């Protein structure tokens, strides 16, 4: 019943956003899924960040999708892993633009390097938003799987470039069951990146993790928790949907409410 209500609300929300720069039918590139209300001078090229005149109060969430296999580019249509209803509804309610950052970064022979490339892509995108008028404290990150992991790595690499973020099943280095076949990923490369992440000055993230996730269950993400620090907040549960729970979230209403509360704590 709750999911039906959320779906109906989302249909109303996104039909009402058609004049706010939604470009969901434009695939093949990074793009705005929707823009905040009443932005001036919206052009047909509104997917170009530089074409929009943001004001001092403008806010944006940068969404980062997952990576299937880092050896090859796999998101050529730039339409994989769209944000969940909970995030889109929250962004719309709070009048925050939502931007889909498409990446086809690959390892190019150096295992794990695709994550660093994705962090660089993120930094370049943030710089464009800065030039368009959005300050770092009004930039938020969100992502699924490797997109969420990219946000964690960004907390160490570019901590002053964004405010905080909401992550869904952040993961890197493949599922646990592949460890015996490809041990280098989870025994060498993942620990190396974990060491980098935990050196971050702050990890202000709301993280949704799933007990039946073959990649990272809540317990595999406990390395993020620092004593006496309120964040990151890890919300763990199971909908029997594994890694892709965020798509059909049995706790969708609670997820939405948590996201709203998390963002509202940012002096909205």
Question: What feature does the model see in each segment?
Answer:
Residues 137-190:
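Primarily recognizes the serine-hydrolase "nucleophile elbow" in alpha/beta-hydrolase
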Residues 111-132:
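Alpha/beta-hydrolase active-site loop
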Residues 170-236:
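The feature captures the conserved acid-bearing segment of alpha/beta-hydrolase catalytic domains
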Residues 229-268:
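C-terminal catalytic histidine-bearing segment of alpha/beta-hydrolase fold enzymes
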Residues 17-59:
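A domain-start/cap signature at the N-terminus of enzymes
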Residues 52-90:
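Short, surface-exposed "cap/lid" segments of acyl-processing enzymes
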């Amino acid at each position: 019943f709750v999911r039906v209500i959320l779906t109906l609300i989302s249909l109303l929300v996104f039909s009402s956003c058609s004049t706010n720069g939604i470009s969901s039918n434009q695939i093949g590139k990074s793009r705005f899924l929707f823009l905040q209300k009443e932005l001036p001078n919206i052009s047909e090229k509104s997917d170009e960040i530089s074409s929009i005149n943001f004001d001092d109060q403008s806010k944006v969430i940068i969404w980062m999708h997952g990576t299937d296999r880092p050896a090859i580019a796999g998101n050529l249509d730039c339409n994989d892993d769209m944000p969940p209803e909970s995030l889109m509804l929250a962004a719309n309610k709070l009048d925050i633009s939502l931007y889909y950052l498409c990446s086809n970064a690959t390892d190019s022979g150096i295992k794990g390097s695709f994550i660093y490339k994705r962090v660089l892509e993120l930094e370049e995108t943030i710089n464009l938003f800065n030039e368009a008028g959005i300050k770092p404290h009004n930039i938020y990150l969100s992502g699924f799987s490797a997109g969420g992991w990219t946000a964690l790595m960004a907390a160490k690499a570019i901590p002053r470039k964004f405010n905080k973020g909401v992550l869904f099943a952040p993961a890197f280095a493949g599922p646990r069951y592949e460890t015996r076949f490809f041990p280098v990923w989870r025994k060498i490369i993942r620990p190396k990146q974990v060491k980098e992440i935990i050196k971050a000055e702050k990890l202000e993230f709301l993280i949704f993790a799933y007990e039946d996730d073959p990649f990272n269950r809540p317990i595999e993400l406990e390395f993020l928790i620092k004593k006496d620090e309120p964040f990151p907040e890890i919300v763990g549960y199971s909908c029997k949907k594994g890694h892709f729970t965020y798509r059909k979230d049995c706790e969708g209403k609670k997820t939405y409410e948590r996201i709203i509360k998390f963002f509202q704590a940012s002096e909205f």
